[in-house]
Amino acid sequence: MAVPARRTSKTKKRLRRTHEKLKSPEISFDENLGDYRKSHHVSLKGYYGGKKVMDKK
């Protein structure tokens, strides 16, 4: 079984973990509908790219 030759320093450990953070969702404002939505997703009213693509259930 492999064992590290040297102890990992706090700096190296923290630099490695900088990519493990949570990202905030990409939210954009749709001016046509006056509503917020996630980028590249259908809005809650069923619109995408200014066109109706889904009927709301």
UniProtKB/Swiss-Prot annotation:
Gene Ontology terms: cellular component: large ribosomal subunit
Composition bias, Basic residues: 7-20
Pfam families: Ribosomal_L32p (PF01783)
Gene Ontology biological-process annotations: translation
Record has Ribonucleoprotein as a keyword: yes
Family matches, as HAMAP family: Ribosomal_bL32
Matches recorded under PANTHER family: 50S RIBOSOMAL PROTEIN L32 (PTHR35534), LARGE RIBOSOMAL SUBUNIT PROTEIN BL32 (PTHR35534:SF1)
Protein name: Large ribosomal subunit protein bL32A
Taxonomic classification: Bacteria, Bacillati, Bacillota, Bacilli, Lactobacillales
Gene: rpmF1
